[in-house]
Amino acid sequence: MDDLMKDRIDLLIDYIMKHCLWQFHSRSWDRKRQNEGILTKTTQLLCDEPVDLGTPADKCYWVDAVCLADAYKSRYPWLKTMDKDDIKALMGALHERLDHLTITGSLNLELTDQHY
């Protein structure tokens, strides 16, 4: 991964960390499912692709994805210069980084507490 990609991921992660409460679910499986749902739909929106709204969960993730995609488009004009494959690669790397920060690399023991 080149430095430009890392810098862009850092900007996108920083926005999520400062503005998106959905990253703070109390269990790891909730966080994993939510990260997947929201970031997949955000990617589809950024790439002007159809978004599946077939379930209540899909609709919930879509609402957060619309807010995130709108914020990204308004704050990071370089997204408009990227082609769909590059956006998908960027968002895939962002997803991996977010999962690490909020799930696998988190020191929050409540994430894995079976009684919580």
Swiss-Prot record:
<keyword id="KW-0535">Nitrogen fixation</keyword>
<protein>
    <recommendedName>
        <fullName>Nitrogenase iron-iron protein delta chain</fullName>
        <ecNumber>1.18.6.1</ecNumber>
    </recommendedName>
</protein>
<dbReference type="GO" id="GO:0005524">
    <property type="term" value="F:ATP binding"/>
</dbReference>
<dbReference type="GO" id="GO:0009399">
    <property type="term" value="P:nitrogen fixation"/>
</dbReference>
<dbReference type="GO" id="GO:0051536">
    <property type="term" value="F:iron-sulfur cluster binding"/>
</dbReference>
<keyword id="KW-0067">ATP-binding</keyword>
<dbReference type="InterPro" id="IPR014278">
    <property type="entry name" value="Nase_Fe-Fe_dsu"/>
</dbReference>
<keyword id="KW-0408">Iron</keyword>
<dbReference type="InterPro" id="IPR004349">
    <property type="entry name" value="V/Nase_d_su"/>
</dbReference>
<dbReference type="GO" id="GO:0016163">
    <property type="term" value="F:nitrogenase activity"/>
</dbReference>
<comment type="function">
    <text>The key enzymatic reactions in nitrogen fixation are catalyzed by the nitrogenase complex, which has 2 components: the iron protein (component 2) and a component 1 which is either a molybdenum-iron protein, a vanadium-iron, or an iron-iron protein.</text>
</comment>
<dbReference type="GO" id="GO:0005506">
    <property type="term" value="F:iron ion binding"/>
</dbReference>
<keyword id="KW-0411">Iron-sulfur</keyword>
<dbReference type="Pfam" id="PF03139">
    <property type="entry name" value="AnfG_VnfG"/>
</dbReference>
<comment type="subunit">
    <text>Hexamer of two alpha, two beta, and two delta chains.</text>
</comment>
<keyword id="KW-0547">Nucleotide-binding</keyword>
<keyword id="KW-0560">Oxidoreductase</keyword>
<keyword id="KW-0479">Metal-binding</keyword>
